[in-house]
Amino acid sequence: MLMVQTNPFLIEGYLSPDFFCDRVEETALLTRHLTNRCNVALIAPRRLGKSGLIYHCFYQKEIREQYHCIYIDIYDTKNLGEFVYALGKGILAALKPKGRKVWEFFLNMLQSLKSTISFDINGNPEWSVGIGDIQSPDIMLDEIFAYFSQADKPCLIAIDEFQTIAGYPEKTVEATLRKRIQNCHNAHFIFSGSKRHMMALMFTSRSRPFYHSSSIMGLEAINEQTYLEFANHHLSKINKEISAEAFSYLYHRFDGITWYIQYVLNMLYTSISDSRVLGKEDVEYCIESILLQHRFAYQALLFQLTSKQKQVLIAIAREGSPSSLMSQEFLHKYRLGASTVQGAVKTLLERDFITQDEGVYQLCDKFLKLSLREEI
């Protein structure tokens, strides 16, 4: 039987430690916090590998055998009802592989939704609940935390993009969650977030409910040399390698951010290049191919913007990481008015085209940034 070879440079998800690069110290620290019954606020820019680290931690023997591990991403949630929906769905997905007794106990705790849970032809539960079925999010949240308290194993719950709850219309969500978490001794949480300023406020401001509730962890880019060795370890299995010069170019082109490096390495792994040693030109070719693949999606994305908003976005892309968008130099260089920039920046931030972090503005999508710079 022909075995399909797995591309070792994963872009999404987690397979096993073989396909996970480094993070030895971070994994040990996160595991130690969780096994010592501490909650953790994990703060780092998007696509640097927070979710991968969480899954890698959950894979550790001392974690996976002793805990129920649950991961949810709440980036797209808009209110408490959608949060509770995502949490319930995530719990069921984590418990289903563990057998009927385990998931049935959870479903029996959800009295408010019992009539809306369906089963497939094999008798396995399906999360057929609609968001509209959750009439009382607070009641369902109570039921979920009752499950956490009574579960047969302690639970570890990772909530990705946790800062999203600060934008919910219900203004007491932070306090509501904090109170329940504080009173639940059989569950511990990883609060993962990419908007560093918002996450820092949530966990270090005296006026916020989660003040001093968690150990705070940050993530830095993976060491360049370590990453190069990881890349060549896998490339060697197909009799290829990437030169140190080419990898350094790739690493710094994307500021060491894992997802973009993985994306290009994924393409290089299946490259039609005849060279055994992949060089800078191979990296450039892959990046150009990726931008070409994304072209129509980016055109549709930019169609949502007004001409002035697009003009400001292109200016930020061209500057790279400007610290001031209101300086006379910036306004004059790109022929922009102060009021135009103010209005555009507000929209671009709200729609996640750009981010403002540590005093600088950047495009959230580095491929889009390169694409816009090429247009000019």
Where on the chain are the PLM-derived regions?
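A short, basic N-terminal segment
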Residues: 1-40, 45, 355
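C-terminal leucine-rich, beta-strand-based interaction scaffolds used for sensing/assembly
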Residues: 2, 6-7, 292, 296-376
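Short, locally clustered residues in the helix-turn-helix/winged-helix DNA-binding domain
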Residues: 34-35, 163, 255, 269, ...
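P-loop NTPase nucleotide-binding core
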Residues: 38-39, 43-48, 52-156
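Conserved Walker B catalytic segment
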Residues: 127-196, 204
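Helix-loop-helix "sensor" segment of P-loop NTPases
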Residues: 201-252, 274-276
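C-terminal helical "lid" of AAA+/P-loop NTPase domains
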Residues: 247-253, 259-273, 311-314, 346
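Conserved C-terminal helix/linker of AAA+ ATPases
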Residues: 270-293
